Amino acid sequence: MNPNQKIITIGSISLGLVVFNILLHVVSIIITVLVLGKGGNNGVCNGTIVREYNETVRIEKVTQWHNTSVVEYLPYWNEGTYMNNTEAICDVKGFAPFSKDNGIRIGSRGHVFVIREPFVSCSPIECRTFFLTQGSLLNDKHSNGTVKDRSPFRTLMSVEVGQSPNVYQARFEAVAWSATACHDGKKWMTVGVTGPDSKAVAVIHYGGVPTDVINSWAGDILRTQESSCTCIQGDCYWVMTDGPANRQAQYRIYKAKQGRIVGQTDVNFNGGHIEECSCYPNDGKVECVCRDNWTGTNRPVLVISPDLSYRVGYLCAGLPSDTPRGEDAQFTGSCTSPMGNQGYGVKGFGFRQGTDVWMGRTISRTSRSGFEILRVKNGWTQTSKEQVRKQIVVDNLNWSGYSGSFTLPVELTGKDCLVPCFWVEMIRGKPEEKTIWTSSSSIVMCGVDYEVADWSWHDGAILPFDIDKM
């Protein structure tokens, strides 16, 4: 065989091997497609298949990577169904940590909003933290002067519970310097109050769209709860105040369906003062524990029926739960009248447990520092001083602030009762600390069947920030 013949032979063999290799690849691809097709994914690789089972309360999310399937069970909720929320509050022995956002610590180097008045509310599939921003970020020049309550820059925004109030995950809800929000099982409803003090307007959003408005009727800082409103079988209830903060004001209960007001009633409470109610559903009614900013160091109680009839009075317990307040030993308690003769106050909460009450309060009697929750035997119906349980959440060496209530719906927990939960705001900056700004973070606790040890889940940010040193 001469050299030319050798070259031709070697070339022919090489070409044959290349063709054979190509054929093997084609056959391999055909077999792979046929096998995956028979596996029930309609020939789609790297895809996501969502199978919905009406007979269960889940969605099965199957992500397929070639021949590997990852199954993730997602909560399922039919958006055509209202939440019931007529169940009783679960009887609990203590409160366990649910979430903590650490917003101010993160905000020293992250894009975190300057906020106040955070609160939590839940849908059938998630809980969200709502908060009133100041239209500025921590450690930025626009944070200067944010101790002010009402400005045109304040907005209601929300994140999933536990997330910091950061720029990247926050969702806009409403323009507001006072607000409430709740979910009826279908969509979120928010109420955001904004505008001048004498002519403020509350704009109701349902599913993110403005649906109704409430104009100030007394011309003196229309305001609302700063915590979750309450939805029962599709109807949502909340309380508003219009009038002075240090003497008799006017109070109204509102009822809305799909974001449109379907009823309202004035609350007759001469000699009493109601602000910033913390409300929750219990046995088919709305129970609210509020703030008396006029004279009382005991908290007003408002119980609302679906027909908007109501019962109003004060938390009976023989222990005061507002701040500032006097000594426990000197307080007698009353179910009908303000007691303690101390002006000012702070937003707080309580939960009825039969005839007992869980009541939260600052540990300090004079300032917003520390936080504890007490169970007082027969404290909902009698002027009892008997503490059967006490749990410390923030020690008295650290700042606290507002606190409020919400519940975990049965659709979320699978229980046959509503889990009581509360949040504690931890205010940092002005007026207590040497900064140019005021903001807060929060700790969230939920009721459990066990006693929980005392600890301090305080804010923990090291101040001042760089912006405060300029």
Describe every region a protein language model picked out:
Residues 348:
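Solvent-exposed helix/loop surface patches that form functional interfaces
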Residues 1-3:
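Short, low-complexity, Lys/Arg-enriched N-terminal segments of secretory-pathway carbohydrate enzymes
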